[in-house]
A protein has these predicted regions:
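Short acidic-hydrophobic surface loop/beta-edge motif
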Residues: 7-12, 21, 43, 124-130
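Active-site metal-binding loops of divalent metal-dependent hydrolases
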Residues: 25, 54-56, 78, 104-105, ...
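Metallo-beta-lactamase
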Residues: 49, 145-195
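Short, well-ordered secondary-structure micro-motifs
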Residues: 31-32, 110-113, 150, 174
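Divalent metal-coordination and catalytic microenvironments
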Residues: 43, 53, 77, 89, ...
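Conserved beta-strand hairpin/beta-sheet module of binuclear metal-dependent hydrolase folds
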Residues: 12-68, 149-164
Length: 195
């Protein structure tokens, strides 16, 4: 079940909104399968936006986007719960929207999509625009080798950080599975987020 999208931030400077759409589906890794919820973020203006992690339910995410132009699909990492609906979502947008993800997670991408194009690479410090919102890519390996967060320093009173599974409420993201490392996630959070 997908929950109705909610506006979590409205920034009158530039008419920017941040909306959250919670989707449900499965996460599969290391021979296991778990029911999970994922936060899908829609960041931008009434005319255009970027979508971060369009997980599980492309129809619901497309409905939340409404009539806006999606300039980018941004992926925080390559686990299947975050990426397995991406191609269907992009196809429903017309097939031309760029998908960006750290290439440190290409092995995870190719496990879901063995054929076809890989996403465009994201790199630490890269600058992007989501509508009129400036986003900075911060590499935060640990949950996966290519995990990143997106920092919007000009949103709200203190900036906004879109963390994917790098940071959960109460602590760091999950580790203990293939390609993850607790020590690495702590180090990357200290370096990229807390400093």
């Amino acid at each position: 079940m997908t929950r109705q999208p909610e506006t979590v931030l409205t920034d009158p400077r530039g008419g920017v909104t941040v909306e959250k759409c919670v989707t449900e589906g499965t996460f599969n890794l290391d021979g296991g399968s778990w029911e999970v919820e994922n936060n899908v973020w829609i960041v931008g203006t009434a005319a255009e936006c970027a979508v971060i992690d369009p997980a599980h339910d492309p129809g619901a995410v497309l409905e939340a986007v409404a009539n806006r132009t999606v300039t980018h699909v941004l992926l925080t990492h390559g686990h299947d719960d975050h990426i397995k609906a991406v191609r269907q979502f992009v196809d429903r947008l017309g097939g031309e929207t760029p998908v960006l993800m750290s290439h440190e997670d290409l092995m995870l991408w190719h496990a879901v999509y063995p054929d076809g194009p890989a996403p465009e690479p994201l790199s630490d410090g890269q600058q992007l625009l989501a509508g009129s919102v400036a986003l900075t890519v911060l590499a935060t390996p640990g949950h996966s080798p290519g995990s990143v967060v997106f920092h919007a320093p000009d949103l709200g009173d203190h900036g906004v950080l879109f963390t994917g599974d790098t940071l959960f409420q109460g602590g760091p993201g999950a580790t203990g599975r293939s390609f993850s490392s607790f020590d690495t996630i702590i180090e990357s959070l200290q370096k990229s987020v807390l400093d």
